Design a protein with these regions (language model features):
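Class I S-adenosyl-L-methionine-dependent methyltransferase catalytic core
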Residues: 1-118
Length: 118
């Protein structure tokens, strides 16, 4: 399991579910929930993350800006994995610093596995 988890969630209902699940798992001491990905800038510069999961609304491409911000601020370690849940028909233009490793199609969903490069 993970030593520490940082959730970024704006939706109040989803945050309540996260909190309830953390309580159920007795994992509150291993997790924090923040509202905005830009709040990561308040973390220690030494803190690095190795797994990112993006599940934006299908029509929303703003997550690409989030990936750029993570790269610009070096919030990732060398072994990072980025997982993105998209509509299978979506066409996204990723930054050159994001390398797609592989994609999987499940029904109308596309799951993209990638990595941020230094």
């Amino acid at each position: 399991g993970a030593n520490k988890v940082t959730f970024v969630e704006k939706d109040l209902i989803a945050k309540k579910i996260l909190k309830k699940n953390l309580d159920y798992l007795s994992a509150n001491d291993k997790a924090i929930i923040i509202d905005d990905i830009n709040d990561l800038k308040n973390f220690s510069k030494k803190e690095k993350f190795n797994l990112f999961f993006f599940d934006p609304p299908y029509k929303d491409n703003f997550f690409i800006e989030n990936i750029k911000m993570i790269w610009k601020n070096s919030f990732f370690d060398d072994s990072n994995i980025v997982i993105i849940h998209r509509d299978r028909k979506s066409i996204d233009n990723y930054d050159k610093n994001f390398k797609i490793l592989f994609c999987k199609i499940y029904g109308r969903s596309k799951i993209i596995f990638g990595r941020l490069a230094k």
